[in-house]
């Protein structure tokens, strides 16, 4: 079967659905060109600053959240691009000439206060430079959001409509709105964006966070001359939040969605697509491993589609949505029971501790260190199957 | 290639240690604890390492084993705690001994005996090795007055005298002994308790006596009738290396034996400069009692092993110059599961040699060995009490030569029995 990774997204043709999000991996024209050489389908330039005196960065500005030595998230206090718009316009023009088959969006706008002329002017100049579309950053959770931009725009429907109206009135290229996760009534905000002419929505951005605290010096991270600020959390830790947001937007507004948040591998990307995203954007995984991850993203997605019989990405976009219901619509007749595969069990006993101390005291260990499940007591919560360290050892079966 | 065998304790290793600790599943009633003769709460100390509370980890280890550091170096962990790690079933077990070494090396910790109300009962502990020290510390904790008699001028017994530096660095041993709360025990160094002293004085003055004097008599060989030079027994050999009397070897060194001590001698010979170090064992690799990991390391370092040979003659003028072996074959034994060996008629092997070490094991020395004599049969294997007497035994003196950790376990067990004996008597 012939599988195509090509995607038509808000009228723009992508050779594959993988984009670099507006972030450190798209920090310069040279970097984006290398990313396109590696095979990325698209890139969104790091959010442009109207006045680069406002994007003077601090050092350090990136911290990570670890578990057992592995990164589960980054939290950053980096601002918009410190490169002048003039430089970017030249770079964007060159990139589009050299890589016409790759999609380039500009991201607007790092500035203080909402000034119509700044948005209109920047949007027009980007369009003239030849970009395929614009992404409006209504979602940056730190820095910008503290000075009236970024996520503070998305917190107010009137502001969304106003800024979107300015930009839509100025350009003909597609305009995508990037919405944050931590905002009141996200579906309502998405609908407002669509009604005001947005051609697509991307979600989510980083979550406003405090990365961690140095417990011996009492200073949170990242530490800038012994002081810190609230930071934007990204990476695998936020993926479930991103999935929820994309699903909510897809269920309420009929609009192309670019899914963002903790995508590391092709399976993550497929999950976002199944809840309604037709392209995905990636930053943190590139920050950790570099552009070369596009190889495994692409081949993994291709093989998944072959296995599932999907010719195009659109064949499976949103297929998970009908399975999301209101909690009170879920069946109460569906009853489960934990069961153990004794051949797989290694006898660690974690299930008995979990069930005993966080469940229903239904699991005791036998003399031979195998779980004995009390069918009367098991309440079907499923905790044991989740904490069991062995694949396919504890599973839930239907009660007859 | 000879490895130093020195433990993990540097910052470079910290990352490995944390990653290894994070693999531990924190099993409920963890099987590894059952595999440890002194039942260290292994998952607990590993979890404390994982959360970087190294002092907490060390406390957890030391509460169960006052020689936790030394045992981290010496325990054949692959045959004890690690053998029972459930992760063996899906991959490789946790390197428990390495983590234990790390915690003990890395953290500062000084023990303090929490003494129960004084009983005014007096116990004599004979022998200041792992078993005796362990028994003495426990007994003091139970509130008894303890006198410990050690024939050498230092504590730790075999660990200090014979186990080579490459297995247990001197500074680690010193640090561990230094961390003990010995002030509450009366320690008498340089006092050799012979049968006379034991029966005439000590037995009259004390309510109970623990004998943990180890084994001091090397099993004899009758091959060196001409008293050739450069023929040693293992204790002599290892002890002379430790005290500096032997600091260099030349030529070919052949060690006879198949236990851990024999392997130590063979590995030590290479370290002292022997061109070849050959270990000669009368049975096959399968029957060899030495810890498998030790044998593997010896082979990696370049020790050669001759299986199924038994020496029958030493030749030379003044110094030993050659050794002759007969080949053996193994025959099943009806009585014990272990195979017996027989010489194969006519199958001989003659090798030039410069140093011969006989590591045939050790026995109880004549004095206290004879004191125990037939009473050995009356030792209660659970309580370690000799008959119904006030005597208790443990360690190598009792078990014929096992690991340090088993000696410590014996000392603890005997201390509990002695406490019970004293309080109920």
Q: Where does each model-flagged region fall?
A:
Chain A
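Alpha/beta enzyme core
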Residues: 33-38, 42, 111-258, 264-271, ...
């Amino acid at each position: 079967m012939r599988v195509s990774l090509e995607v038509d997204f808000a009228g723009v043709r992508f050779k594959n659905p993988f984009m670099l999000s507006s972030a450190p991996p798209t920090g310069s024209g040279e970097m984006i060109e290398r990313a396109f050489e590696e095979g990325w389908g698209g890139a969104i330039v790091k959010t442009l600053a109207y006045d680069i005196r406002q994007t003077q960065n601090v050092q350090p500005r990136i911290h990570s959240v670890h578990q057992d030595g592995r990164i589960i998230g980054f939290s950053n206090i980096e601002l918009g691009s410190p490169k002048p718009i003039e430089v970017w316009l030249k770079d964007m023009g060159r990139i589009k000439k050299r890589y016409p088959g790759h999609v380039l969006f500009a991201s607007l706008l790092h500035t203080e206060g909402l000034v119509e002329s700044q948005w209109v002017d920047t949007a027009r100049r980007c369009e003239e430079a030849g970009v395929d579309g614009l992404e409006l950053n209504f979602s940056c959770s730190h820095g910008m959001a503290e000075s009236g931009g970024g996520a503070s725009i998305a917190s107010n429907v009137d502001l969304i409509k106003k800024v979107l109206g300015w930009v839509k009135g100025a350009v003909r290229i597609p305009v995508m709105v990037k919405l944050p996760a931590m905002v009141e009534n996200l579906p309502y905000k998405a609908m407002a964006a669509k009604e005001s002419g947005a051609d697509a929505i991307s979600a989510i951005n980083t979550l406003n966070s405090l990365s961690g605290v140095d417990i011996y010096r009492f200073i949170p991270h990242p530490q800038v001359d012994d002081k810190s600020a609230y930071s934007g959390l990204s990476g695998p830790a936020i993926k479930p939040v991103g999935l929820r947001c994309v699903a909510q937007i897809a269920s309420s507004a009929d609009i192309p969605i670019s899914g963002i948040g903790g995508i590391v591998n092709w399976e993550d990307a497929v999950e976002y697509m199944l809840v309604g995203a037709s392209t995905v954007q990636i930053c943190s995984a590139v920050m950790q491993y570099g552009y070369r991850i596009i190889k495994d993203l692409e081949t993994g997605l291709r093989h998944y589609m072959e296995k599932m019989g999907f010719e195009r990405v659109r064949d499976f976009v949103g297929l998970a949505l009908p399975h999301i219901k209101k909690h009170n619509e879920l069946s109460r007749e569906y009853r489960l029971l934990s069961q153990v595969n004794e051949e797989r069990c290694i006898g660690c006993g974690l299930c008995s501790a979990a069930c005993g101390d966080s469940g229903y005291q239904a699991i005791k260990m036998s003399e031979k260190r195998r779980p004995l499940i009390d069918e009367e007591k098991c309440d079907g919560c499923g905790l044991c199957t989740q904490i069991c360290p062995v694949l396919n050892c504890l599973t839930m079966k239907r009660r007859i | 290639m000879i490895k130093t065998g020195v433990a993990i304790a540097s910052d470079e290793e910290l990352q490995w240690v944390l990653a290894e600790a994070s693999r531990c599943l924190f099993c409920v009633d963890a099987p590894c604890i059952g595999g440890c003769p002194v039942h260290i709460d292994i998952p607990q100390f590993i979890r404390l390492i994982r959360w970087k509370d190294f002092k907490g980890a060390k406390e957890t280890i030391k509460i169960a084993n006052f020689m936790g550091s030394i045992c981290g170096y010496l325990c054949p962990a692959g045959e004890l705690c690690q053998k029972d790690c459930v992760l063996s079933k899906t991959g490789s077990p946790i390197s428990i001994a390495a983590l234990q070494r790390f915690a003990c090396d890395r953290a500062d910790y000084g023990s303090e005996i929490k003494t129960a109300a004084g009983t005014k009962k007096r116990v004599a502990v004979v022998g200041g090795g792992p078993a005796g020290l362990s028994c003495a510390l426990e007994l003091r904790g139970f509130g008894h007055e303890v006198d410990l008699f050690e024939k050498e001028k230092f504590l730790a017994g075999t660990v200090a005298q014979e186990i080579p530096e490459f297995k247990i660095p001197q500074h680690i041993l010193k640090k561990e002994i230094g961390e003990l709360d010995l002030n509450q025990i009366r320690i008498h160094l340089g006092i050799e308790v012979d049968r006379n002293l034991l029966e005439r004085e000590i037995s009259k003055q004390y309510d109970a006596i623990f004998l943990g004097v180890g084994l001091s008599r090397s099993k004899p060989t009758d091959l060196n009738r001409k008293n050739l030079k450069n023929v040693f027994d293992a204790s002599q050999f290892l002890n002379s290396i430790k005290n500096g009397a032997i600091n260099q070897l030349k030529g070919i060194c052949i060690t006879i034996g198949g236990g851990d001590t024999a392997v130590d001698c063979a590995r030590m010979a290479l370290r002292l400069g022997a061109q070849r170090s050959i270990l000669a064992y009368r049975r096959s690799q399968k029957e060899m009692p030495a810890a498998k990991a030790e044998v593997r390391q010896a082979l990696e370092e370049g020790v050669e092993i001759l299986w199924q040979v038994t020496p029958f003659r030493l030749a030379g003028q003044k110094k030993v110059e050659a050794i002759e072996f007969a080949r053996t074959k193994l025959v099943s034994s009806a009585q014990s599961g272990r195979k017996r060996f027989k010489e194969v008629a006519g199958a001989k092997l003659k090798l030039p040699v410069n140093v011969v070490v006989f590591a045939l094991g050790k026995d109880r020395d004549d004095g206290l060995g004879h004191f125990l004599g037939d009473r050995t049969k009356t030792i209660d294997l659970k309580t370690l009490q000799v008959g119904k007497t006030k005597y208790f035994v443990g360690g190598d003196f009792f078990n014929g030569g096992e690991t340090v950790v088993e000696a410590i376990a014996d000392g603890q067990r005997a201390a509990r029995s002695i406490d019970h004996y004293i309080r109920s008597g």
